[in-house]
């Protein structure tokens, strides 16, 4: 494997008491495969059922029950690998990972160790400051999820729910290419976006569909990697950032005090803002991996992989590039719009819907600033928007025609958002049309000039005062005066 060697970024260094430190981060993201049935049984993967309601004899590890691979889960893993620009291994092997845990009924987990279904790939991560960084994908393998232990139903007993047991997971392992909490959060956000575009994982972290094991180490700039600690099962992007910052500080304090870091598995406690030791970090030999004798090697036909590849949707990076090229959007605006598949589709229906080709920049500005801003206030997303793309398109058409001004458009949008209706009908019914009658605008301007001779003297000495006259005229016209006509008349009347 060729390692991506990333130069030290001084902006990402952490200041310690004895100098600067660089944090090195790698992530193992566990993504639940979007499928109706589990990896090796026909039991349902539906979330939220009564305990032990979706459990087959295979999931419960009853004697004599043999696993049978779910082809759709394999297809979803291959689609994900293709979406990550990764190598697809036509032959892969399922292994038994041996360890004991109460919610693991087999006494081992079926996973993939030496021969995963997907090899090396890459994710391009866009950071808030406009920088883009490549993050290497080391591998993607399929494995079973475990069940769930429940400890809060009784003070003296623990219970096991096997509904989740046997559900297919994709473990997506990144290289240690990340250098800050912000980069790690951006990486998981981008990875989740790709999975959602592909339809291979819902990415709902609240339901446990996506969770991460976070590997953190620190070193002096330019030195070899330090000893890493793994923070298990972090279940939100915000907590991933907090866990990294907390663990990096803990390690720096130990090293600056002359201590050493023990390689171990830790848990993040968001309430206390600390990581706690869980157990010493296992090595691969501790799990006694060996090929599962109940499962033949998984052999994929090249033409089947090509068929899956031909059916892939347009992914975020390609869509972003197209939005920039076709609609003239800035990289930032295009990035905001493609962050979710639904928002990208909504924008395209506004900019290019109903057979009308609209100004892309104007459409993006209105969708991002007006629609998204209003939805955020209501705690909604675009899928539950009360305003349709057709309605926003109609508002933009009214602006382009000169029927309404940009200011009136905001008022009109608020009416449509709260009350609904056809924008054109609302404009007519409420008298919101822009005043384009030059005579009417001139009359308003004459009245303001006549009433404010002192301001006239000031604007002749200080032309920037023109804005005051514009404001007064707009107020007098109820915000309906055509802004360009108003400016032209004012300048002519005032002689500036």
From Swiss-Prot:
One of its GO terms (biological process) is glutaminyl-tRNAGln biosynthesis via transamidation. The keyword Transferase does not apply. Keywords: ATP-binding, Ligase, Nucleotide-binding, Protein biosynthesis. It catalyses: L-glutamyl-tRNA(Gln) + L-glutamine + ATP + H2O = L-glutaminyl-tRNA(Gln) + L-glutamate + ADP + phosphate + H(+); L-aspartyl-tRNA(Asn) + L-glutamine + ATP + H2O = L-asparaginyl-tRNA(Asn) + L-glutamate + ADP + phosphate + 2 H(+). Its EC number is 6.3.5.-. SUPFAM superfamilies: GatB/YqeY motif (SSF89095), Glutamine synthetase/guanido kinase (SSF55931). GO terms for molecular function: asparaginyl-tRNA synthase (glutamine-hydrolyzing) activity; ATP binding; glutaminyl-tRNA synthase (glutamine-hydrolyzing) activity. HAMAP family: GatB. Heterotrimer of A, B and C subunits. Allows the formation of correctly charged Asn-tRNA(Asn) or Gln-tRNA(Gln) through the transamidation of misacylated Asp-tRNA(Asn) or Glu-tRNA(Gln) in organisms which lack either or both of asparaginyl-tRNA or glutaminyl-tRNA synthetases. The reaction takes place in the presence of glutamine and ATP through an activated phospho-Asp-tRNA(Asn) or phospho-Glu-tRNA(Gln). Belongs to the GatB/GatE family. GatB subfamily. This is Aspartyl/glutamyl-tRNA(Asn/Gln) amidotransferase subunit B.
């Amino acid at each position: 494997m060729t390692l991506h060697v990333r130069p030290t970024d001084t902006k990402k260094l952490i200041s310690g008491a004895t100098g600067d430190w660089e944090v090195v981060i790698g992530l193992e993201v566990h993504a639940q495969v979007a499928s109706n049935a589990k990896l090796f049984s026909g039991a349902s993967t539906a979330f939220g059922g009564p305990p032990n309601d979706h459990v087959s004899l295979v999931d419960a590890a009853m004697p004599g029950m043999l696993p049978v691979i779910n082809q759709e889960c394999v297809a979803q893993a291959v689609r994900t690998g293709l979406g990550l620009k990764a190598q697809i291994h036509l032959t892969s092997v399922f292994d038994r990972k041996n360890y004991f845990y109460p919610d693991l009924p087999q006494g081992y987990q079926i996973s993939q160790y030496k021969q995963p279904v997907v090899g090396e790939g890459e994710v391009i991560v866009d950071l808030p400051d406009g920088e883009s960084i490549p993050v290497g994908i080391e591998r993607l393998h399929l494995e079973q999820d475990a069940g769930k232990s429940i400890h809060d139903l009784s003070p003296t007993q623990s219970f096991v729910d096997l509904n989740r047991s046997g559900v297919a997971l994709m473990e997506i392992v990144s290289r240690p290419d990340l250098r800050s909490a912000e980069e790690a959060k951006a990486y998981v956000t981008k990875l989740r976006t790709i999975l959602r575009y592909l339809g291979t994982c819902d990415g709902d972290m609240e339901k446990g569909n996506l969770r991460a094991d976070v590997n953190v180490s620190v070193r002096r700039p330019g030195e070899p990697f330090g000893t890493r600690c793994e923070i298990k099962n972090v279940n939100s992007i915000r907590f991933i950032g907090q866990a990294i910052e907390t663990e990096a500080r803990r390690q720096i304090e130990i090293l600056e005090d002359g201590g050493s870091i023990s390689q171990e598995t830790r848990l993040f406690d968001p309430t206390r803002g600390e990581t706690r030791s869980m157990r010493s970090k296992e090595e691969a030999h501790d799990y006694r991996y060996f090929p599962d004798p109940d499962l033949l090697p998984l052999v994929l036909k090249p033409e089947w992989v090509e068929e899956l590849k031909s059916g892939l949707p347009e992914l975020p990076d390609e869509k972003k590039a197209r939005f920039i090229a076709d609609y003239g959007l800035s990289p930032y605006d295009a990035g905001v719009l493609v962050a979710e598949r639904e928002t990208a589709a909504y924008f395209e229906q506004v900019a290019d819907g109903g057979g009308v080709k609209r100004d892309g920049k104007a459409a993006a500005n209105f969708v991002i600033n007006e629609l998204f801003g209003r939805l955020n206030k209501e705690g909604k997303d675009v899928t539950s928007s009360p305003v349709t793309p057709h309605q926003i398109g109609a508002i933009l058409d009214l602006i382009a025609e000169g029927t309404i001004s940009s200011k009136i458009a905001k008022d009109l949008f608020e009416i449509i958002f709260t009350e609904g209706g056809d924008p054109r009908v609302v404009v007519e019914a409420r008298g919101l049309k822009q005043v384009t009658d030059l005579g009417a605008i001139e009359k308003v301007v004459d009245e303001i000039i006549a009433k404010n001779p002192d301001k006239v003297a000031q604007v002749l000495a200080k032309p920037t005062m023109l804005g005051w006259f514009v404001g007064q005229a707009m107020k007098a016209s109820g915000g309906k005066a055509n802004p360009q006509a108003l400016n032209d008349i004012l300048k002519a009347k005032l002689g500036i």
